[in-house]
Amino acid sequence: YYQNIIETANYIIKYFNEPIDYAVVLGSGITLELEDQQELGYEAIPLFPGNKHANRVKGHANKLTFGKISGKNVLVLNGRLHYYEGYSMKDVAFMTYVVKHLGVKGLFITNACGAINTNFSEGDIVCLDDFINGRK
């Protein structure tokens, strides 16, 4: 497992050929505009657990996008694997470990969430303190 993480990180570093300052994981339907962007589909990444099966979550582009924001190199993970899709927790966490081995200074994770609080509007920033695991 660890060797696959290292090999995947090395593949991404070689593919984009620039240091990566920050990484962002986008949730369903969320986009991010980058300057000078390049893309790499998950299916093209050797050893990536998600390249064997199509991700079934609507709104996930299933690709890495590399580019710049305010002069900083940013890697965007457009979609991720989910435990409820039948992936193991190791598979779900795989790209987070890869990002760590890319040497980024920070990782920002977004998601689409539902709430019962009627004061929330689309696009609000919320802090999750609990969730429902529908896969028990």
Where are these regions (language model features)?
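N-terminal cationic-hydrophobic initiation segments that often serve targeting/anchoring roles
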Residues: I13-F16, K100, N117
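Phosphate/pyrophosphate-binding betaalpha-module
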Residues: C113-K136
